[in-house]
């Protein structure tokens, strides 16, 4: 290894995207750099006045197989991989008549762009680059004497070092090599993500090979592969993270141009880390209620209110009424077009973010002109059920995203264990409450009436406190009105004792829906029976941590 700068006398350039190449061309011409290139890149450089040698003239072998083989030749790769600080390498190059490269500039076939375009399988496969990654990895490995450039953002830097003859130091070449390895790793991870989805293990191999984890348990390898590889592209950095002393950035899936991360911002200040967290939670929450029109108000990743209405304005009014104090500085999500009437009701409320699939022109104009700091987001499509990924020290936890799709989420599968069967209106409220409870942090208790939340107890370490909190918020946030009486209640998990359910019963709820499954279920059910309260068991839990 050497710490000396190595001037750039000979360069290999092969890029799919030609943007910015003019900067390099000008420097090559000025410095008299010998340039070897391929196909369309060579043509572009020649048009810019660079004296170019085609790769085929170096190898003595033409491009073949529809361009699949261009640079895969010892005359190219030996020139990339020869460590010129090693006398044996230098001697062998001289024996074979091969000249070394000082600089390799490569960007790869646009695989992710091709996938996003909806291309068929054959066209997608053709955009899996082979020669490009080989050159990149070879040059990165041989950073002792070669500078590898994969990022067009570095072209200006490269041009200046070519033009002034200084080249790059070893530390700089290491930095460029690290970027190059990250580039090819992300590229391969993107290909892996696509192939894993489109080329699952065929049924013909199930009897031949059974995937098992390190404990001998059979594994669905399509869902949980032996190596979990994903890549995300940095969209932009954020002002700060969850707190002002934390740095943060937004990354997006290169294969997907939809989803909340790709929201179109129509007004307001830049999104913060907390804005993204709360708005994403609100967005998922309202779509749990589809196809009904729903509005959610979320703060600190918990709903302050959620409601279904005949119109967006009605749904917002009902959702806001649940907890007007907490809604201050919150995030509003609507799964329907925001109308002028809804915008007018939002206007006097301090709100950080509003997100919806669309806005009436008059509604958008009002929000843009009267609430200049309000972040206005438009997301055309509902959320998709991808994996839920959480990083822990030294690893990742991966699970299915919790959706309202379990057997116990269907009210037809519920088991009536106490009281009379709910009438149509009560059942509607129970179904609403059960769907709403999924988005509340555990331990979660939710009271609802007229398909709107009226009291929410969230995030308590015991269920009794969550029950007390839900009742308290129902009865102290409504100008003295008793909203718990006659409401229905939902619990995200079973009642371990009868005491939590008794709090709800004493508050006057008329029906409760909960998973069941406690060893003391009979005590809980008996408390409901004694009070004449309807109780359904779902058999499904919706913890949310």
UniProtKB/Swiss-Prot annotation:
Q: What reaction(s) does this enzyme catalyze?
A: (6R)-10-formyltetrahydrofolate + 5-amino-1-(5-phospho-beta-D-ribosyl)imidazole-4-carboxamide = 5-formamido-1-(5-phospho-D-ribosyl)imidazole-4-carboxamide + (6S)-5,6,7,8-tetrahydrofolate; IMP + H2O = 5-formamido-1-(5-phospho-D-ribosyl)imidazole-4-carboxamide
Checking PROSITE patterns in the record gives: MGS
Mitochondrion keyword on record: no
GO biological process terms, semicolon-separated: 'de novo' IMP biosynthetic process
Protein's pathway: Purine metabolism; IMP biosynthesis via de novo pathway; 5-formamido-1-(5-phospho-D-ribosyl)imidazole-4-carboxamide from 5-amino-1-(5-phospho-D-ribosyl)imidazole-4-carboxamide (10-formyl THF route): step 1/1; Purine metabolism; IMP biosynthesis via de novo pathway; IMP from 5-formamido-1-(5-phospho-D-ribosyl)imidazole-4-carboxamide: step 1/1
Q: Which UniProt keywords apply?
A: Hydrolase, Multifunctional enzyme, Purine biosynthesis, Transferase
List the Gene3D superfamilies. 3.40.140.20, Methylglyoxal synthase-like domain
Cellular component GO terms held in the UniProt record: cytosol
- Tell me which EC number(s) this protein carries: 2.1.2.3, 3.5.4.10
**Gene Ontology molecular function:** IMP cyclohydrolase activity; phosphoribosylaminoimidazolecarboxamide formyltransferase activity
Notes concerning its domains: The IMP cyclohydrolase activity resides in the N-terminal region.
Listed NCBIfam families? PRK00881.1 (NF002049), purH (TIGR00355)
PANTHER family per record: BIFUNCTIONAL PURINE BIOSYNTHESIS PROTEIN ATIC, BIFUNCTIONAL PURINE BIOSYNTHESIS PROTEIN PURH
Q: Which family does it belong to?
A: Belongs to the PurH family.
Q: What is the protein name stated in its UniProt record? A: Bifunctional purine biosynthesis protein PurH
Source organism per entry reads: Bifidobacterium longum (strain DJO10A)
């Amino acid at each position: 290894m050497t710490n000396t700068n190595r001037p750039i006398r000979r360069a290999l350039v092969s890029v799919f995207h030609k943007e910015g190449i003019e900067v390099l061309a000008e420097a090559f011409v000025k410095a008299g750099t010998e340039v070897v290139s391929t196909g369309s890149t060579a043509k572009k450089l020649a048009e810019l006045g660079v004296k170019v040698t085609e790769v085929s003239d170096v190898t003595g072998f033409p491009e073949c197989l529809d361009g699949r083989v261009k640079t895969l030749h010892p005359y190219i790769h030996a020139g990339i991989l020869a460590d010129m600080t090693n006398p044996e390498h230098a001697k062998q190059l001289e024996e074979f008549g091969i000249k070394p490269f000082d600089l390799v500039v490569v960007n790869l076939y646009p695989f992710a762009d091709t996938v996003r375009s909806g291309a068929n399988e054959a066209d997608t496969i053709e955009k899996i680059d082979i020669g490009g990654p080989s050159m990149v990895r070879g040059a990165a490995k041989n950073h002792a004497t070669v500078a590898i450039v994969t990022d067009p953002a570095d072209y200006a830097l490269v041009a200046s070092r070519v033009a002034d003859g200084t080249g790059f130091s070893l530390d700089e070449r290491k930095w460029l090599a690290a970027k190059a390895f990250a580039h090819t790793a992300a590229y391969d991870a993107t290909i892996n993500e696509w192939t894993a989805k489109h080329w699952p293990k065929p049924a013909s191999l199930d009897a031949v090979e059974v995937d098992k984890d390190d404990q001998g348990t059979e594994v669905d390898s399509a869902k949980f592969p032996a190596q979990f590889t994903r890549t995300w592209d940095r969209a932009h950095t954020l002002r700060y993270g969850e707190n002002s002393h934390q740095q943060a950035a937004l990354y997006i899936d290169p294969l997907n141009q939809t989803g909340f991360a790709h929201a179109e911002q129509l007004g307001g200040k830049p999104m913060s880390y907390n804005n993204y967290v709360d708005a994403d939670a609100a967005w998922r929450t309202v779509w749990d209620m589809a196809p009904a029109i729903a509005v959610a108000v979320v703060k600190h990743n918990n709903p302050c209110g959620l409601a279904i209405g005949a119109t967006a304005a009605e749904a917002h009014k009902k959702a806001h009424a649940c907890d007007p104090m907490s809604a201050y500085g919150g995030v509003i999500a609507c799964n329907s077009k925001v109308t002028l009437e809804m915008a007018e009701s939002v206007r006097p409320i301090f709100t950080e973010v509003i997100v919806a699939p669309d806005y009436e022109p008059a509604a958008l104009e009002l929000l843009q002109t009267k609430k200049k700091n309000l972040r206005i987001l438009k997301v055309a499509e509902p959320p998709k059920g991808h994996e839920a990924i959480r990083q822990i020290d030294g690893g990742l936890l991966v699970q299915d995203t919790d959706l309202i799709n379990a057997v116990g989420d269907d009210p037809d599968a519920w088991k009536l264990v106490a009281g009379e069967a709910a009438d149509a209106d009560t059942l509607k409220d129970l179904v609403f409450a059960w769907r709403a409870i999924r988005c509340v942090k555990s331990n979660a208790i939710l009271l609802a009436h007229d398909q709107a939340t009226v009291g929410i107890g969230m995030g308590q370490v015991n269920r009794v406190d969550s029950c007390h909190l839900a009742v308290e918020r129902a009865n102290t946030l409504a100008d003295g009105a008793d909203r718990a009486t006659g409401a229905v209640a939902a619990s995200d998990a079973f009642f371990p004792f009868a005491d939590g359910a008794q709090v709800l019963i004493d508050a006057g709820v008329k029906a409760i829906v909960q998973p069941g499954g406690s060893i003391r279920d009979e005590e809980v059910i008996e408390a409901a029976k004694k009070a004449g309260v309807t109780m359904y068991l779902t058999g499904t839990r919706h913890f949310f941590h």
